[in-house]
């Protein structure tokens, strides 16, 4: 996908996408006020370039031949290097070749929908041009999600629960787990995940329960187990619920926050599709297996909200980096197909994976992230009788049941010291009050970034989305034959 500027210029493309592609190159130049970028066409759609020819722009023919020859040689050399090193040419900045035209340059690209994890949500703008932001009414976005899910046979009640989940993520700023993943849930239901029904309690003893998620949407299973954990905690002081046969349940904090709003301390764990290279391993073998712990403090709207993966970041963060046009990510985030740290988001998503919390080596503490991921399997995959470790299906294998295990814990603080809520408030305030290293950056506690983003959303009067996200959602709306929600510029 390309975008034309007011001056008729186009920019940012992928000149080389596979060892089989045959670039059709035309360099166009105008001598004087500006230099216009080159134009390509490729037959390969390996990273999503559909072979669309960019419109021709004026050029100086005397300079066409030498620069064309130079570009062909450059691209050929790039191809050899990429083949030898097995890296994406885009990550080498050849694939994002840009010729600056002063104020005229604008960059826009569309990359492929499939990646290593099977998360089908990409549409990239170059980082060289700052994206615009848009705001959409919460109710309209909610209705959009419901209609999209109903288009594949999901019941309205189940679709509404998923919409609540995705909006929660976007409003608090976790875009990696919001509407960015709507296409995944659509494809899951289209591929066999049940869009209606109810989980079943298989076993209940005292404060514990074992639940069969019946291959329903993770949001539905998560809500069912959360409500059951709250009920058990009100009766016994603690409720511990584990399930099997669930699916991706979205942002982990969504469920402990519900528990916290019931006056309890909430915990939640889930296992996920393998995407982490365990410490010392050159093969993927663990999921990100996030954990969340939430508790409300004395002041309304304040509290502790921890939501973390056993990887340095969630895979969706790498996706969002790509959606927002970032050509490089921190080296501790992910690795290429051989388990080597990589700053190229495409290398991470296309055959690579994530690194455990702590990075690549024991010296950096990666064994701790590996241990946390394995602990998640104890609580979810093993206690729940679900798939575990490398046995969990890949995101690509939508024809197989995910059979994820999840764990939900509710604890009544009233069963312990009577000062929990007040002391939690004191603890949070004292931590925030510590002297910062950088005076411009105050000390934060878990939950502060979410509160800041929620306030920003409220001030904007809706949910804030980037230009790249809006573009992807418009394409999804067309694909599902539903009306796109209205939005306006966030000024």
What do these predicted ranges mean?
Residues 210-298:
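A generic, well-ordered mixed alpha/beta core segment in the N-terminal half of proteins
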Residues 180-228:
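Active-site cofactor/substrate anionic-group-binding motifs, chiefly glycine-
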Residues 80-126:
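N-terminal mitochondrial targeting presequence
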Residues 276-349:
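Phosphate/diphosphate-binding glycine-rich loops and adjacent basic-rich segments that engage nucleotide
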Residues 162, 166, 259, 293, ...:
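Buried hydrophobic positions in well-ordered alpha/beta secondary-structure cores of metabolic enzymes
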């Amino acid at each position: 996908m390309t975008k034309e500027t007011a001056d008729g210029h186009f920019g940012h493309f992928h000149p080389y996408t596979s060892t089989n592609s045959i670039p059709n190159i035309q360099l166009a130049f105008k001598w004087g006020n500006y230099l216009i970028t080159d134009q390509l066409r490729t037959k390969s759609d390996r990273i999503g370039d559909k072979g669309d020819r960019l419109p021709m722009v004026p050029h100086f023919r005397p300079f066409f031949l030498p620069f064309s020859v130079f570009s062909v040689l450059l691209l050929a050399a790039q191809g050899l290097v990429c083949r030898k090193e097995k890296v994406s040419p885009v990550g080498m900045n050849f694939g994002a070749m840009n010729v600056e035209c002063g104020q005229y340059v604008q960059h826009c690209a569309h990359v492929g929908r499939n990646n290593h994890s099977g998360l089908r949500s990409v549409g990239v703008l170059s980082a060289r041009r700052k994206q615009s932001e848009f705001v959409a009414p919460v109710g309209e976005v909610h209705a959009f999600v419901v209609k999209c899910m109903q288009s594949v046979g999901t019941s309205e009640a189940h679709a509404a629960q998923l919409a609540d989940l995705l909006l929660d993520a976007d409003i608090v700023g976790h875009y990696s787990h919001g509407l960015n993943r709507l296409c995944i849930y659509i494809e899951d239901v289209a591929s066999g995940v049940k869009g209606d029904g109810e989980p079943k309690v298989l076993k209940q003893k005292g404060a514990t329960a074992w639940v069969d998620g019946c291959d329903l949407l993770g949001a539905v299973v998560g809500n069912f187990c959360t409500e059951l954990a709250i009920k058990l905690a009100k009766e016994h002081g603690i409720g511990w619920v584990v399930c099997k046969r669930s699916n991706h349940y979205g942002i982990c904090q969504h469920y402990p926050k519900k528990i916290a709003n019931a006056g309890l301390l909430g915990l939640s764990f889930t296992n996920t599709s393998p995407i982490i290279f365990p410490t010392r391993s050159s093969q993927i073998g663990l999921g990100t297996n996030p954990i969340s712990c939430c508790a409300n403090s004395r002041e309304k709207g304040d509290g502790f909200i921890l939501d973390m993966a056993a990887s340095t970041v969630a895979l969706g963060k790498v996706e969002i980096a790509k959606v927002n046009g970032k050509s490089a990510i921190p080296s501790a985030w992910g690795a290429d197909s051989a388990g080597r740290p990589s700053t190229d988001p495409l290398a991470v998503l296309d055959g690579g994976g994530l690194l455990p919390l702590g990075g690549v080596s024991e010296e950096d503490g990666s064994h701790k992230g590996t241990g946390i991921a394995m602990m998640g399997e104890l609580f979810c995959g093993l206690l729940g009788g679900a798939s575990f470790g490398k046995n969990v299906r890949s995101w690509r294998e939508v024809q197989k049941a995910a059979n994820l295990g999840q764990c939900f814990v509710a604890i009544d603080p009233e069963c312990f010291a009577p000062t929990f809520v007040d002391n939690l408030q004191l603890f949070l305030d004292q931590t925030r009050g510590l002297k910062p290293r950088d005076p411009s950056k105050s000390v934060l506690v878990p939950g502060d970034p979410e509160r800041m983003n929620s306030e920003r959303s409220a001030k904007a009067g809706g949910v804030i989305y980037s230009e790249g996200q809006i573009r992807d959602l418009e394409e999804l709306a067309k694909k599902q034959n539903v009306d796109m929600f209205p939005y306006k510029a966030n000024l």
